[in-house]
Structures are given as C-alpha cells and as structure tokens.
C-alpha cells in the first residue's frame, strides 16, 4: 500500500507515430475519471490508426478522433469535466502537457486529446474566489460584484480544459509534428497536416 500522502503510480504509455515515439505519463490521482477514460480507449485500441488532424505550431497538436480518411471513430459517452480539481492538484496547460479536447460543453470530452506545444494559460480553468455570493470577480477586464457562486461554477467560459498527463520523452517528435506543413483536409478547412501524422498505437509500458 502507498504511504499516506503518496500519489498513485502514474501509468506510463508510448504513443507510437509515423514520426517517432512519444512517451507520456498520466495522473489518476489528479484526474481519475479522465485517466480511466483514456486508458479504456487505449485498451480498446481506439487510437491505433488515428491521426493528428489539427496542428497549430504555437498552440497544440490534437488527435485521436479520426482515421487517415477523416472518418470519425465511434466513441463512448462523454465524461465529466475534471479541470478544476486537476488544476488545484497542480496540472496546467503548459508545454508538453496533455489535455482532453471537447466542444463548448465542458462535459463533452470523449477520446480526442491534445498536447500543448507552448504554455497555454488561457486554457486553464478560471479560479473562483471563496464566498457565496462572490463579492468580487474579475474576468477579462470586467469586474463583477456579489455574484451567486453557482452562476460562476456553471459559467461555460470558466471551465477550461482538463489536463491529465505530460510528455516525459519525445518532445522532439512533438515539435516535428507541430512544424509540419498544414492546409485543408477532409471536412477541415485549415490546420490539417498535408502529410498524415498517424498514431500507429498507444500502449502501456508500465
């Protein structure tokens, strides 16, 4: 049994791509549902043969949802957003960290993930001050006073993106991917690698 205060073992995985291997570790103690969801997709071999379909050099690389013909893979039900608890535990959208992609609905993440290629603090959940109502809250230059706490907790723009792991080796591969030429592809008008960047497999190594 782990000692008191010791975190759970961080699962280590290898993302094998046609550009090289990326090693990652995940943090089930900080984002348990997110990590369990990702590991289930790995076990199901969902990611094998998918592509990084969205590559923006000074932002992130995103994949895990489409094959090389831009056909969307079937996915399970979305998971609960865990961004706030993950950030409280120290995880942020910094260079080399993995986060779940989603729609405007914070609780819509399924299989797609992204790797931050720069520090993206604006993707982090917005901290909400103590109190109910919250006496003073500032957001993007606007100051709000005496706001019911529930309103802030449910404000879609404050959720951010759930970070659940980081790259431990292979950032050279990530950087190679992020600088690949992009353009149109399938249903996407921009940011698609002109030469497909394929995830051959994601496997547990520990």
PLM region spans:
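Cyclophilin-like peptidyl-prolyl cis-trans isomerases
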Residues: 1-206
């Amino acid at each position: 049994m782990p000692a008191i205060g010791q975190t759970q073992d961080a699962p280590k995985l290898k993302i094998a791509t046609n550009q090289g291997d990326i090693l990652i570790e995940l943090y089930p103690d900080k984002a348990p549902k997110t990590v369990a969801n990702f590991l289930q997709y790995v076990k199901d071999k969902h990611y094998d043969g998918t592509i990084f379909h969205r590559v923006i050099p000074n932002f992130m690389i995103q994949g895990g949802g489409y094959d090389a013909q831009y056909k969307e893979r079937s996915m399970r039900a979305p998971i609960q957003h865990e961004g706030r608890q993950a950030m409280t535990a120290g995880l942020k959208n910094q260079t080399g960290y993995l986060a779940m992609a989603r729609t405007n609905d914070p609780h819509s993440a399924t299989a797609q993930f992204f790797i931050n290629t720069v520090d993206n603090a604006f993707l982090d959940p917005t901290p909400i001050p103590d109190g109910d109502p919250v006496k003073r809250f500032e957001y993007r230059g606007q100051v709000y006073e005496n706001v019911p706490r529930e309103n802030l907790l449910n404000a879609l723009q404050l959720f951010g993106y759930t970070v659940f792991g980081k790259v431990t080796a292979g950032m050279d591969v990530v950087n190679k991917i992020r600088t690949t030429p992009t353009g149109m592809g399938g249903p996407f008008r921009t940011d698609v690698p002109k030469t497909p960047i394929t995830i051959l497999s994601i496997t547990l190594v520990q």
